Amino acid sequence: MSERYSFSLTTFSPSGKLVQIEYALAAVSGGQPSIGIKATNGVVLAVDKKQQSFLYDTSSLSKIERVTDNIGMVFSGMTADYRLLLKQARKVAQRYFLVYKESIPCTMLVQDVAKVMQEYTQQG
């Protein structure tokens, strides 16, 4: 029965669930854990980076990236989604810096990246 409701990102099944969101959560649940700790003088970001195959070059798999001098991103989930969001975050941060000559506030950057995520959730 859920197949009838899985075609649309915004169509609820009779049980009140968004089937596409459940599919996405199932896909992401297989990701490696990541953690961020805020301290008084900085932050610590850590990820569990397991080699999936001996064919992978683990030095080329980075789950922590710098967005600006004072903002970093970490992910656990779909690599392609992360790359798109990282690229968007860097563009927004650069635009902000070109206009205001200072680093973008973290909350503003988070809001902009969240908008991108929301658009993809609603449009597919």
Task: Place the predicted regions along the sequence by residue.
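Long, low-complexity N-terminal extensions
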Residues: 1-124
